[in-house]
Amino acid sequence: MAINSSHHFCPMTTTTTTSAKFVDSLGSSFCKFHGTSSSISLRSYRFGFSFMKNVKRLSCEGSSSSSSSRNENWNRTQKQNQFRPSKVVLNRRKDERFSDLGVISGENSSRSGDVGGGSGSSSTMEKIVEKLKKYGFVDEDQFQDKEVEQERRIEKSSVEERFYVEERRGGFSEESPFGVYGGNDEVKFPWEKVSSMEKKELVNGEWTAKKESRYSLAEMTLSEFELNRLRNVMFRTKSKMRVTGAGVTQAVVDAIQEKWKGSEIVRLKIEGSSALNMRRMHEILERKTGGLVIWRSGTSIALYNYKGGSNRDGSGNMNKQVYRRAERLPSSLPTSTVDQSVQLVNLPQLEKEPTVVGNKDRTSPQEVEYEDEINELLEGLGPRYTDWQGGYPLPVDADLLPGIVPGYEPPFRALPYGVRSTLGTKEATSLRRIATVLPPHFALGRSRQLQGLATAMVKLWQKSLIAKVALKRGVQLTTSERMAEDIKRLTGGMLLSRNKDFLVFYRGKSFLSLEVGEALMEKEMLVRTLQDEEEQARLRASSALVVPSIKANQQLARTLQDKEEQARPSALVLPSTKANQNLVSAGTLGETLDATGKWGKNLDNDDHVEEMKQEVEKVRSAKLVRKLERKLAFAEKKLLKAERALAKVEESLKPAEQRTDLEGITEEERFMFQKLGLKMKAFLLLGRRGVFDGTVENMHLHWKYRELIKILVKAKTLEGAQKVAMALEAESGGILVSVDKISKGYAVIVYRGKDYKRPTTLRPKNLLTKRKALARSLELQKREALIKHIEAIQTRSEQLRAEIEQVELVKDKGDETLYDKLDMAYSSDEETEETDGEEDDVYLDTYEDEGEDDEEGGIQANGSLSETDVEFGSDESDTDFGDNSASSTTPETTFVELQNEELDVQP
């Protein structure tokens, strides 16, 4: 018996006895639970039952007296509730037989509650379906067999009432449905896809959104049969032509044309930077070769020699080619009424201009006129760069322009009154945005001799605010920064932006057109001419006043010369100025003689000249001596300060003495230990800190698993390495086996001994900690540098004393070459002495109270370095364990070059 979800479970009286008992038991159970609805579990489904007014038929006579009272209460409650009939729920699940039976799955029942139990509210999906059927969006025939013909009332405050959309803007009504009208008055949702019938009409049933939005030029030009044939031919073609990073050059185009003579298909393999944008390479190949790309996958392209028209030339205008090709396309392409976007088929976007099939006016006359004007302008600037990988128009090849233009000068500029020379932020941003979409005007590949490019840019600036220069890829020894500076210097323009691909120049607010510049230059030349004439007139007027007194001046000059000869022993000449009171003496000989007599000395005396030279030599020598003495005193002061700091650091350093009761080993054992130690992969690296507590701790940790330990020391000399080895032997208690020279420095092999016992304290207390060892290393380095500096100053001072003695020898005749050499050698500025402070003491105080818990890196047995320190140092004091031969930071103390040689095993 099929049970529909909208029917109520009311068994008829004509049933069998078994069914009657089932109904009686069912009614008694309903009376017992006082429920308005119930459900019976059947596997994973539940039967929903609703009770109407005829629920009174379910008798409860078999129950006890207590159950009869409960039945009366239940009937009274049932009369008050007056349950409404439930709605039909549209079940779109696969198991439709359960929905026909009124069965709802367990997971649905958990979400929707007792949908079939007679509740007044229905599911939201049912309301949506009813609304769609009401306005004709859903066909009612498919639900006709499943529906129950009964009246349905919209309950107040129901979900459907809340789901209702008012008839207003954005609403949903019959006059203005929430959709669009098709060609046959069919209402379509905006998001509704194309139907199967329309898909078949479009592209033989193979419709995709990608094909709908974008078609290749080959698909629109060739038929489907021809395209499939060409692709089959392409797959049988094995040979491929490589296109390198230079792109589609003229040589590549010629090679493709040559291959087309023997085959109609050419397969290409794109490599390098050109493979980063295959869509762009697709367009470039079609534009330059005149062929059609019939297949493209990854970096592989198949190019077809299309001979559909004689007007398809690879070197012609790209836009005009595409427009003519699009006009020859068949106009019988199917159209769809679904959406306006389906009717538009876009060609490949060339030069960022969409080309639409069926649109006759693809570009406005203004755009075509602008392109023709730019093309004509670039043709007048110079030869084109035919290997340009971008779009149309082709830029001018700046490398073919003359490098040097005779008589070239930067253009004349004049800033208008009240105009700022700099660009504002908004203006610069606007110009940069314009330059982003503009094609480049020039293609440049050299960094020098750019006068020809500057001349062409000035011509371009007559009609354009911006000049865009593209940098050729793959050109060696080119620097965009240098290019930009040279162009800016030659043209006077303003650099807007610079990157690895383009240079953008703004002509500037002071740029003048050719006519205006020539007019202003003529005016400026006229002003200069007038100024020159005025100056000459002034000079003529002043000379007219001086001419009458020329003879008097000549006589005065003779008189002064006579007096000068008479009074030559005297140092000063006191000429008479009474005769000059009535003369114009500015710039005359009399004025010069008067000034010489008052403030000048007689330099004609050779003795006076020699005396002055000797005085200069003495002053120069004394100055050099004082400078070196000051340097020497300052260096000695710093050295004393470094000695105090080093002594302060070494207060806690108490090195152990060499043991006299060492355990001896035979020569055979020493040889074997040396051989085994040099072959060990695990080693301990001794850094610039030298031997401190962490070094000894690592040695004991190493001896826990091995009898030998190999320590690498980068000392300058063998004596320094031996000094470090003896310190390691004394502090660790081991037996020194050997010190060998290897490619990485020196290898110190230490044997732990036959009666070795691990000490209770691995870190000895008489050595420095890690931080104090670093501070000590820095102070040693500073002291060593000061010692070398003092030695250099002393050497220079001795050299200076020898030179002073040489000056005494040439006292009668000055040696100018000697003092010039001294000036070059000692031309450094005088150093200012530093005040005595406690900066170093403050630095050293940071190492006073450090804990003893600083641990050094452990030893790694796989050959990796267990660094006790960052780098090696060999600067040690008298109580140090390293090499005291040099400092680790001065040029004289650089480490010996590592030698790639075999281990030298010493017997």
UniProtKB/Swiss-Prot annotation:
Residues 621-654 form a coiled coil. GO terms for biological process: Group II intron splicing; mRNA processing; plastid rRNA transcription; RNA splicing; rRNA processing; seed development. Expressed at low levels in roots and shoots. Gene3D superfamilies: YhbY-like. Residues 828-857, 868-881 have a biased composition (Acidic residues). The keyword Membrane does not apply. Residues 1-59 form a transit peptide. The keyword RNA-binding applies. Keywords: Chloroplast, Coiled coil, mRNA processing, mRNA splicing, Plastid, Repeat, Ribonucleoprotein, RNA-binding, Transit peptide. Residues 62-89, 101-123, 824-907 are annotated as: Disordered. Residues 70-84, 882-897 have a biased composition (Polar residues). Residues 220-316, 421-518, 663-763 form the CRM domain. One of its GO terms (cellular component) is ribonucleoprotein complex. Its main location: plastid. InterPro entries: CRS1/CFM2/CFM3, RNA-binding_CRM, YhbY-like_sf. It is found in: Plastid, Chloroplast; Plastid. Disruption phenotype: No visible phenotype under normal growth conditions, but the seeds of the double mutant plants cfm3a-4 and cfm3b-2 fail to germinate. The double mutant rfc3-2 sprt2-1 is rescued for primary and lateral root development, intracellular distributions of plastids in roots, as well as for plastid rRNA level compared to the single mutant rfc3-2. One of its GO terms (molecular function) is mRNA binding. Interacts with RNA. Part of large ribonucleo-protein particles that contain CAF1 and/or CAF2, and RNC1. Interacts with RFC3 in plastids. PANTHER family: CRM-DOMAIN CONTAINING FACTOR CFM3B, CHLOROPLASTIC, CRS1 / YHBY (CRM) DOMAIN-CONTAINING PROTEIN. Binds specific group II introns in chloroplasts and facilitates their splicing. Exhibits non-specific action during plastid rRNA biogenesis; RFC3 prevents unaccurate splicing to improve the accuracy of plastid rRNA processing. Acts on subgroup IIB introns. The substrates of the subgroup IIB also require the CRM domain proteins CAF1 or CAF2, with a simultaneous binding of CFM3B and CAF1 or CAF2. Required for seed development. This is CRM-domain containing factor CFM3B, chloroplastic. It comes from Arabidopsis thaliana (Mouse-ear cress).
